[in-house]
């Protein structure tokens, strides 16, 4: 790759965000191109986020070219030890399934999986109605759905208010959500970005939702973003779920308590939720603490309004849902990278799953989803119980997907 002068703006973009890629034109000269999707940015350091943004994308650089470009962008002196370390990092990313292959889109979730997700992992309509009632969502309510996947929840909320934004890291999911919204005649603002970086004006949203994704995210960064973006009196919902199938279930070896993907947390679901509630509550308490002077724009709303504007845990609600865990659910749950991480190949794996499900009765395929809704509110007083295990659960319906 020939030396190239990078503009200050392009250099800062590449340093600040992994959502830009250094691509190669037909004559071999590099240029800053459109957004790419570095799925691994959840856990990568800034150094490797830059590297990943250089290395991925449909017209991304080769490994050696990415290393050369990295040294130019960081103004670092090329060193053999560092070059080897960077190449090793790329090899590790590929073997871990983070990078599918050089010059390919790095998304784990393609259009097929997005459709399976919408059809076989729909967000429960009963829970959507609960959120609408709890937050008083109406036509004028501004809603942000964080890490919202292909829009399972956001699309339902868009039927209540036209002011719904979906923020999602997977490009495949963003495209699927936009297509579904267009097909349904719905207004949906889809943003291709990580929920770890809420780059919005103060108090922009009345309601923020985060469903089944907090475990993927940096919760400190998420809470910092919420203290900035949540409007006065606004609601932040963290929705957690846990699936439970009998050991005799045909797919217990994949989604059971002890499976090829690893063992599940043995604690009761209520205690897992209680631990999460406590952690998030302490984070909000620290981030909204008054009388601590910092040059942090995230503090502006809380500091100006005082204690009444703090984000506090207002309520917790539990729900139960009986539903089938079948071939469709498995396809919506497992990517090819998940499968290969177990040492199996997707083709034989899916053939076995299909055979097991075909031989089972509908009753044998059933299991239970436990749901919890943690409701945080800006302003007011804390209202969650001391012991979550004493909370009852409300039964909600499973609505079979239509073909």
Annotate each language-model stretch with its function.
Residues 199-208:
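A short acidic, Gly/Pro-enriched loop at the edge of an enzyme's catalytic core
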Residues 40-105:
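Long, charge-rich, low-complexity alpha-helical segments
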Residues 221-232:
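A short glycine-rich, Lys/Arg-flanked "PGG" loop and its adjoining helix->strand segment in the class I
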Residues 150-197:
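Class I SAM-dependent methyltransferase SAM/SAH-binding core
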Residues 291-401:
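Conserved Class I S-adenosyl-L-methionine
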Residues 235-320:
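Conserved catalytic/acceptor-binding region of the Class I
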Residues 102-138, 140-147:
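Conserved class I S-adenosyl-L-methionine
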């Amino acid at each position: 790759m020939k030396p190239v002068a990078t503009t200050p703006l392009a250099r800062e973009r590449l340093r600040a965000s992994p959502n830009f890629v250094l691509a190669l034109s037909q004559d071999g000269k590099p240029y800053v191109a459109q957004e790419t999707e570095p799925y691994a940015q959840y856990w990568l350091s800034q150094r490797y986020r830059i590297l990943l943004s250089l290395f991925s994308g449909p017209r991304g650089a080769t490994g050696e070219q990415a290393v050369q470009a990295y040294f130019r962008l960081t103004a670092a002196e090329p060193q053999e030890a560092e070059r080897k370390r960077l190449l090793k990092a790329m090899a590790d990313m590929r073997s871990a399934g983070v990078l599918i292959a050089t010059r390919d889109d790095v998304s784990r979730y393609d259009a097929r999986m997005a459709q399976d997700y919408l059809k076989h992992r729909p967000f429960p309509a009963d829970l959507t109605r609960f959120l609408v009632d709890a937050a008083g969502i109406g036509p004028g309510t501004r809603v942000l759905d964080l890490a919202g996947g292909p829009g399972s929840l956001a699309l339902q909320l868009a039927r209540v208010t036209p002011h719904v934004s979906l923020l999602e890291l997977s490009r495949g999911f963003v495209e699927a959500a936009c297509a579904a919204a267009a097909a349904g005649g719905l207004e949906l603002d889809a943003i291709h970005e990580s929920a770890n970086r809420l780059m919005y004006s103060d108090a922009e949203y009345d309601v923020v939702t985060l469903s089944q994704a907090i475990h993927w995210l940096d919760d400190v960064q998420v809470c910092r973003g919420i203290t900035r973006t949540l409007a006065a009196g606004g609601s932040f919902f963290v929705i957690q779920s846990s699936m439970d199938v009998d050991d005799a279930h045909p797919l217990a070896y994949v989604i059971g308590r002890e499976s090829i993907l690893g063992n599940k947390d043995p604690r009761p679901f209520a205690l897992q939720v209680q631990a999460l509630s406590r952690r998030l509550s302490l984070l909000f308490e620290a981030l909204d603490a008054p009388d601590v002077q910092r040059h942090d724009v995230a503090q502006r709303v809380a500091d100006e309004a005082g204690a009444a504007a703090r984000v506090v845990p207002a309520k917790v609600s539990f729900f139960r849902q009986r539903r089938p865990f079948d071939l469709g659910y498995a396809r919506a749950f497992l990517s090819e990278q998940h499968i290969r991480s177990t040492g199996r190949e997707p083709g034989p794996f899916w053939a076995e799953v299909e055979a097991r499900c075909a031989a089972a009765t509908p009753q044998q395929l059933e299991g239970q989803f436990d749901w919890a809704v943690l409701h945080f509110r800006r302003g007011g007083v804390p209202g969650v119980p001391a012991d979550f295990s004493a909370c009852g659960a409300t039964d909600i319906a499973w609505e079979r997907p239509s073909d």
